[in-house]
Amino acid sequence: MENKSPSKKNKPPSCGSLVTILSLDGGGVRGIIAGVILAFLEKQLQELDGEEARLADYFDVIAGTSTGGLVTAMLTVPDETGRPHFAAKDIVPFYLEHCPKIFPQPTGVLALLPKLPKLLSGPKYSGKYLRNLLSKLLGETRLHQTLTNIVIPTFDIKKLQPTIFSSYQLLVDPSLDVKVSDICIGTSAAPTFFPPHYFSNEDSQGNKTEFNLVDGAVTANNPTLVAMTAVSKQIVKNNPDMGKLKPLGFDRFLVISIGTGSTKREEKYSAKKAAKWGIISWLYDDGSTPILDITMESSRDMIHYHSSVVFKALQSEDKYLRIDDDTLEGDVSTMDLATKSNLENLQKIGEKMLTNRVMQMNIDTGVYEPVAENITNDEQLKRYAKILSDERKLRRLRSDTMIKDSSNESQEIK
């Protein structure tokens, strides 16, 4: 069986002092919010290291679920020059252009018709535009070709278990070296919104692996812990790229986790309201899909909770930054309202989130609370950008030193 190990250009953690992870939540059109924040972070890195700086240059792992998986691909798939296909500043314009075609809104008489019959007869959207778009943009690029390690969760409905597409996993399971476009289509196939994605992959020996995928959000809408686990497995397996890191050495991890907003404070549902719901009402209620909302919110919340506990236990809260907003209400809380006004409002929410105070989860109550220091998300991102820049420079310096020492040893042997 052909083993296509990932070949990344970034210097590994063994040359530095940290493992750097960027995690991107799912959320449909709300991915615009993450796009605004990522553009700000990349701009800070460019101010430190030059206009050619890209996020993929600074993170050992970029993880994304659903819409976050699409953004992950945009940031890590190479163009013809070997650099990222998209800069972070391109994400918001991309969403503004393509979301109305991915999530076409009914107009005229169709807008007046009930939506429920459509949902009962098939997915809300055909997904054809999204599939064609991703196939065109990402082409034949496969998982091993991304510019840094990526982790994208999906769920296989035939096997009834998660399928995690991880660059690291290719070392032991080459069957996962599929086209990145297929991964993105799979992780975006939200039940009731898009049809599941079927495809197969054949290795050099003719062995065929089939995939029957739906949205990774049913597995981990917030992929932070999935990414941390992927790295930890490599440490346990003594991957030389990890240097002397310990299996549970999360105090050496630097994690930026970006959400796409939630409706927790809106309190859309209640036991009293849902008491008489049957199957149909759980699938559709006033434009929302309650069962999907609950699944995704519980997933993202539990992962943030456990991540918070880990970093607090290690007294490393300053190495874990979660940027999110749980106050979304109305149109901006939906995953698929792709009207011009709603997309622009989501962009404004992202800009406002940058100026919000940094929040941490109270691990006793599960409630978001501002950190003791009066610091905003944009100020914290500037601090993280400096750490990322310094880490990259340290790795380059140590790598050059190791190469020089190795060369000197070779000369002495001769």
Curated annotation (Swiss-Prot):
Entry keyword set: Cytoplasm, Hydrolase, Lipid degradation, Lipid metabolism, Phosphoprotein, Plant defense
Entry GO CC: cytoplasm
Inactivation phenotype: Decreased number of lateral roots.
Domain PNPLA: 22-228
Motif (DGA/G) on chain: 215-217
pH-activity relationship: Optimum pH is 7.0.
Active site: 66, 215
Gene3D superfamilies: Cytosolic phospholipase A2 catalytic domain
One Pfam family here: Patatin
The keyword Translocase appears for this protein: no
Record note on modification: Phosphorylated at Ser-399 by CPK3. Phosphorylation enhances PLP1 activity towards phosphatidylcholine.
MF GO annotations: monoacylglycerol lipase activity; phospholipase activity
Cellular localization per UniProt: Cytoplasm
Main location: cytoplasm
Statement: the UniProt record of this protein carries the keyword Aminoacyl-tRNA synthetase: no
Record InterPro entries: Acyl_Trfase/lysoPLipase (IPR016035), PNPLA_dom (IPR002641)
One record GO biological process: lateral root formation
Free-text comment about domains: The nitrogen atoms of the two glycine residues in the GGXR motif define the oxyanion hole, and stabilize the oxyanion that forms during the nucleophilic attack by the catalytic serine during substrate cleavage.
Family: Belongs to the patatin family.
Summary of the function given for this chain in its UniProt record: Possesses non-specific lipolytic acyl hydrolase (LAH) activity. Catalyzes the hydrolysis of the neutral lipids monogalactosyldiacylglycerol (MGDG), digalactosyldiacylglycerol (DGDG) and phosphatidylglycerol (PG), and less efficiently the polar lipids phosphatidylcholine (PC) and phosphatidylinositol (PI), but not the storage lipid triacylglycerol (TAG). May play a role in root development.
Protein's recorded name: Patatin-like protein 1
Organism: Arabidopsis thaliana
Gene: PLP1
